[in-house]
Amino acid sequence: MTDLSSWTAYFQDFGQFFNGFLFTLALAIGSFILAMVLGIFFGAMSTSKRPILRILARIFVEFYQNTPLLVQFVIVFYGLPLISDHTIMIPIYWTAILCVGLYHGAYIAEVIRSGIQSIPSGQMEAALSQGFTYISAMRLIILPQAFRIILPPLTNQIVNLIKNTSTVAIISGVDLMFVTKSWSALNGNYIPAFLGAALLYFSLCFPVAQFGRKMEQANKKAYSL
């Protein structure tokens, strides 16, 4: 059903889609903050001279990179209440932030690791010899230089994170994808619903991608001077 009436019905109920869009936006922001914190933390651990820290970081990265995000949603939202006799029950919003944040935190950790390792090791050694702690050397010397290297893959991860928020629909989160699926199934208007959802996701992802490209170009100009 793709005639004018289907689009009329879609725009009449657009408020539902917009609320789902706002939920998706809030979810993306929360997940991104968690993913960045975890990514920087485990990315730095991956380059530590202490084997135990590298091993722990590797376990985190390998586990989340090699298990499907949908499975992680099911385990956290449905599994934890069952194994804890319903003493651990995480709300849908926080479940989504936790799962998406952990999942992309593992990928961002690899991006951070590759960026750190691209910086000559002598810079860290020089910083430590000047009295910097490992953390302060990372924060003030290594990571700022690594940023221009990791910007393109980091931008890709942010875009993927936004798109992967749609997986919260599996636990009936009121995000854009869940609203789209529910509304289209109820009304039989699949094309307007999913085309509208695609445009709304595009309105989130495209500006991020463009911003990343502009930042990358600005960095290239700055370092070429």
Q: How would you describe each model-predicted region?
A:
Residues M1-L225:
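Transmembrane alpha-helices and adjacent helix-loop boundaries
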